[in-house]
């Protein structure tokens, strides 16, 4: 991985061969980033604990508040119902982002040769809880607006919502590392994330594709089990059982895929911010 101030334009990018050659290079880099991220996870399997904690935490949170929301549905005060719904929507997002922040912190520890301790990483993430809460609320609001646009405007709304969703995902790709490593306030974390994405857009997109393909391959056995079992089942109960077994087979792969994505994200953040890569990624020529 070569230091530099930002992405360079591949030679001959003005022609068709240069354009597609550049895309191939970016995608190739993305697959190599995914492979190196898998190597980091093999060396530090504890990193995969954080997505598990997130999943368990979301389920536990929903179980706790579901009764309150049920009561709120019959409440006379609309404010109580709205507040309960807001908690139901924002709470799982907060739990997920908190665990994601802890994983990001643990990944940096692993890159720097320290043991990625679970407790220390969660304490570090909790020290940024105001920004994490703000980001969770923003995510919920933006997500609701995009869904509303998609559902209310037909095909045109679907297209616009999809484009805006991709743009939002790109703009906010580095929000969690910016919060964890820079303690950025809510008003600037999205702006700084967008700047970092601009500097590494090709590598980031390549990494997302590479990690996405790896994650798909990891969950493919579960999809196959669910699909084959569903079509071979002779009863509704058998079909449901096949789907449940397939989900159980796919979940570990899904959690590993989430972990790989965050490992690659921290590596890209380090490169964009410090112009140097973690040792595990140092020989990748990212900007070619």
Residue ranges and their predicted role:
Residues 1-288:
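Hydrophobic alpha-helical membrane segments
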